């Protein structure tokens, strides 16, 4: 065991002497209280340690002991429905042990060592096993939790525990070389879990939000960023994704944001029902709370802890969504640690390796064939909080170069009460063409063409709005006024969505397609009517416009009949005008 002494303390960074032989990213116990820290730089026998707890009261000369192990998480049954801090300490059990404030140096196992799980073996003595294979299963909240062989273990099974109830500490399989396999294993957070191979992203990550699913889709196993200034709806958008997306498991990392936002999740999710299992939504969620009043250094760890837990569920064949709220706070933590270490700053004081760290994090997303031969996916959605909504700052620009979908939130839309406040002229998705075959097969053959038509109308409307602001709407011809009116219908009746409305909070692809078809059918008929000499004012008086406006509040079950009636009414109304 390597033991040194504290030489200097600078906020969360501690510099220790006499650490010859220690390795990068080893975990240390710092000071008399044994605070958790991680070595982030070595220089001769001097180690630079970032401490994941409050360093107030530490003194020069106190001991620093290296454990020789990297920062690792415990992966096994008992994580779902859990809430952890940034280094995977269970907050619920810390509260039972020390009260509502986290005592420094407190040691609590991430997984409950007392609870018994119903084990069903899937291997027998004599079987050859290797990393990623399923040893057995455990039921957890309606899920079948697969107990996996750790990725770096292989051998022949010597004995297997019969079906029954065991704790996570009891060995359930013993290999011939004496290796004991328990229901859980540990994995270093900075190392991506290995896979057989990555697959092309060709199925959509459906969110239930029309603007995202239709105009800016993200693929299952893709990456997306939600940049936006304060109050533009980043957190509500991410919580909507966590509630309604078609992922099996959601890992929600609150990284440096307000504590009340984690409280919202803790209050709302247990009351909402998961459409797949019928149980509370909280049962498919793992929360990592590392709020703004917690130590800065643990923000960096919380992002890695979250993505490692997501990879573990992916290795079981689940599709996992990782919500990181917000990556800007993580970047600010990097900046603070970097400045304490007196490293050379780059743009706006961020360290030069900011883009590399962001890329290494987003790179861990993907749709894969796991070591066990299953298909799983991790989709990462990261919020970015640029100060003052300035999209040219380094974190936003670095993220922009990495992610596949960019959902830009706009404060001016939020102030106009247009939610989700995603700016359709400033957002993009690189997954659209890859997902078109899926849409043609599963939604409708003409779906991509309708989406492109909607997109084109919005662009034309944006161009005409500039003219209107200069000379007023009377200077436009009827055909151009029609484009502006249809653009308004698309914005208000299609892109807007109420996250708190029982029907409108979630919209299926079939319903979104139906509303698109209604709006475009109206536009086509109106365009033909204007060519025949009908005035735009007559068209805008038609009662069918109200029916299109009400479509988003019609339930999924009633929508097909409503759609048929609306299409007949549109054709009938324009025949009457002729």
From Swiss-Prot:
Keywords: ATP synthesis, ATP-binding, Hydrogen ion transport, Ion transport, Nucleotide-binding, Translocase, Transport. Coiled coil: none annotated. Its EC number is 7.1.2.2. ATP binds at residues 228-235. SUPFAM superfamilies: C-terminal domain of alpha and beta subunits of F1 ATP synthase, N-terminal domain of alpha and beta subunits of F1 ATP synthase, P-loop containing nucleoside triphosphate hydrolases. It is an enzyme of class 7 (translocase). It catalyses: ATP + H2O + 4 H(+)(in) = ADP + phosphate + 5 H(+)(out). Gene3D superfamilies: 2.40.30.20, 2.40.50.100, Bovine Mitochondrial F1-atpase, Atp Synthase Beta Chain, Chain D, domain 3, P-loop containing nucleotide triphosphate hydrolases. One of its GO terms (biological process) is proton motive force-driven plasma membrane ATP synthesis. It holds the Pfam family ATP-synt_VA_C. GO terms for cellular component: proton-transporting ATP synthase complex. Produces ATP from ADP in the presence of a proton gradient across the membrane. The V-type alpha chain is a catalytic subunit. NCBIfam families: PRK04192.1. Belongs to the ATPase alpha/beta chains family. This is V-type ATP synthase alpha chain. It comes from Thermus thermophilus (strain ATCC 27634 / DSM 579 / HB8).
């Amino acid at each position: 065991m390597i033991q040194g002494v504290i030489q200097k303390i600078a906020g969360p960074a501690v510099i220790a002497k006499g650490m010859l032989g220690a390795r990068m990213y080893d975990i240390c116990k710092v000071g008399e209280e044994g605070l958790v820290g991680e070595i982030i730089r070595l220089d001769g026998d001097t180690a630079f340690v970032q401490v994941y707890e409050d360093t107030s009261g530490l003194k020069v000369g106190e001991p620093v002991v290296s454990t020789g192990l990297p920062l690792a998480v415990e992966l096994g049954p008992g994580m779902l429905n859990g809430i952890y801090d940034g280094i995977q300490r269970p907050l619920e059990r810390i509260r039972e042990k020390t009260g509502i404030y986290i005592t420094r140096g407190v040691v609590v196992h991430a997984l409950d060592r007392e609870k018994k799980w119903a084990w069903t073996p899937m291997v027998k003595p004599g079987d050859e096993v290797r990393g990623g294979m399923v040893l057995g299963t455990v039921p957890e909240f309606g899920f079948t939790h697969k107990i996996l062989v750790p990725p770096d273990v292989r051998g022949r099974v010597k004995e297997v525990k019969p079906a029954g109830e065991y704790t996570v500490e009891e060995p359930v399989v013993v290999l011939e070389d004496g290796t004991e396999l328990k229901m859980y294993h540990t994995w270093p957070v900075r190392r991506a879990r290995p896979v057989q191979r990555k697959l092309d992203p060709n199925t959509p990550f459906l969110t239930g939000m029309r603007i995202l699913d239709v105009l800016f889709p993200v693929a299952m196993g893709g990456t997306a960023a939600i940049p936006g200034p304060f109050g533009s709806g980043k957190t509500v958008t991410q919580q909507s994704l966590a509630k309604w997306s078609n992922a099996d498991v959601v890992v929600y990392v609150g990284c440096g944001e307000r504590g009340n936002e984690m409280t919202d999740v803790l209050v709302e999710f247990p009351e909402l029902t998961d459409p797949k299992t019928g149980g509370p939504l909280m049962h498919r969620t793992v929360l990592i709370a590392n709020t703004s009043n917690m130590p800065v250094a643990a923000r960096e760890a919380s992002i890695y802890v979250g993505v490692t837990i997501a990879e573990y569920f992916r290795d079981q064949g689940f599709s996992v969504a990782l919500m990181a709220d917000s990556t800007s706070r993580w970047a600010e933590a990097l900046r603070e640690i970097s400045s304490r270490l007196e490293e050379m700053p780059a743009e706006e004081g961020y360290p030069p390796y900011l883009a590399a760290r962001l890329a290494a994090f987003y790179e861990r997303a993907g749709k894969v064939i796991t070591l066990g031969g299953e298909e799983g996916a991790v989709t990462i959605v990261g919020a970015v909080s640029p100060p003052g909504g300035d999209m040219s700052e380094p974190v936003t620009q670095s993220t922009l170069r990495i992610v596949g979908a960019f959902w830009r939130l706009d404060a001016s839309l939020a102030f106009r009460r247009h939610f989700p406040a995603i700016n359709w002229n400033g957002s993009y998705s690189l997954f659209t063409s890859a997902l078109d075959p899926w849409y043609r097969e599963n939604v409708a053959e003409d779906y991509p063409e309708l989406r492109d038509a909607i997109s084109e109308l919005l662009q034309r409307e944006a161009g005409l709005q500039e003219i209107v602001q200069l000379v007023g709407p009377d200077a436009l011809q009827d055909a151009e006024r029609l484009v502006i009116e249809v653009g308004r219908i698309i914005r208000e009746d299609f892109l807007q969505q109420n996250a708190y409305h029982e029907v409108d909070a979630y919209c299926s692809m079939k319903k979104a397609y139906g509303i698109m078809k209604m709006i475009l059918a109206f536009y086509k008929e109106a365009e033909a009517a204007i060519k025949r000499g009908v005035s735009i004012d007559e068209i805008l008086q038609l009662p069918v416009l109200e029916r299109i406006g009400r479509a988003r509040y019609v339930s999924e079950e009633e929508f097909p009949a409503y759609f048929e009636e609306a299409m007949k009414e549109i054709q009938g109304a324009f025949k009457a005008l002729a």
